[in-house]
Amino acid sequence: MTGHRFRISIVRFIASYFIAVAIAAFATSARAQANIDVDERRTTPVPHRYIHGILGDAKFQIALPDNWNGEFAMGARGFSGDENASGAFKTVGLQKGYAYALSDQGWNRFTIIDQPEDKYYESRRRILQLTQYTKALISRYYGKPARRTFMVGGSNGGHNTKMMVEDYPEEYDGGLAGYGITSHIEWMGSNTRFVRNFDVIASRIDDIIVKRTARPNWDPATTPLSPPLTPDQLQALLNIYNMPAHVGGLAFNIGRVPGSEYRWPPASAKWPLGSYTAILGYATTSVAKFDRFYDPNGDGVLSLDEIKAWDPNLSPPPVANDLRRFDNTGDLQHPIIIGHGSHDPIVSPGETLVYKRLVEARFGVAGARKLLAVYFIPGMGHGGAEYDAALPAMFNALEAWVDYRESGGRTGSPPPNVLVGGLGSYPRN
């Protein structure tokens, strides 16, 4: 090649390179542009600027309090929620001065089956996208960046909180993860196992609840009801208590705990806290999306009985390969506080127990206590007034813990051995 041609080639290469960089920068900028449909002043729970819009294909809300504490609480919604399903996290956060944001994550539980482009895994990208967008907005609005950013959320949002703090330690300084899923594939499998086994014991659930209430340590295998359960009924009851599962190489029990039976039936005047219908609903709206191969009789439609029979252990490898990407790992660099109801029928307390073990497997028991604090709330189901009333104390504990870690113990404090909430006190697990 002549020197002239060589110089032309170099010039073309450099020009092409900078054009590519410019295009990439433009694309990134375009992706970060939000379409705002509401930007207004609101006064409850405290005076703040409220913004609503769409970023990518995800709807969002942002709240910027007048009395800003210099920090940012990034929310994560529940499995059935949207960008407005903030629960008490927004209320308490704004009252304490945090800027707050929440995304619908680009998918909806009730329509995702009809939207091929929507994926559960999209949550990670959409949460990160809104986090970065809100941080930039905070800097412009208040004239300085947020000093800290926390992830907060319950249920699916509790899972997302753990996921984002694990995966993006440069973005988040810690999190409040309420009653969260640890493995989505195991959680959905536990839902179908629950409903198909509950159907077998449904005619005897009143007797089971009465017996458990009278004798909290009752063992149905050794102390029969009168009249006794049939062998099939006894096995079905035991199947609800004991559901083998695994995540991150650890085996655990994702079953529903003894003592929570009053939360199992369909909700009714007699059993107002019953959750059967809700658990069945998760399965009916989700199994076909979780497992695109599942169609036992090949007719292209999943019947209710087929949905109840789904078992992820029998699904082909691509199902686990896809959904296991969503498993929490326990790989923390910043602290997380978890609150979970001891009688939760929707997300088994076993999911939080195994998450604690995941962290311990990486850092040892002593090391895990420097990164994770777990509090079980006696008798609470899937979230509730007890958790909401404890949120101010949890925010305070997280702030003090981060202070303690960042200062090398000179300021702040580790998480309390007993968390004193508004409706009770809860020992650290």
What are these regions (language model features)?
Residues 33-429:
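C-terminal His-loop and adjacent cap/lid subdomain of alpha/beta-hydrolase
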Residues 13-25:
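Bacterial N-terminal signal peptides
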Residues 1-11:
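N-terminal secretory signal peptides that target proteins for export/translocation
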Residues 28-32:
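Sec/Tat signal peptide C-region and signal peptidase I cleavage site
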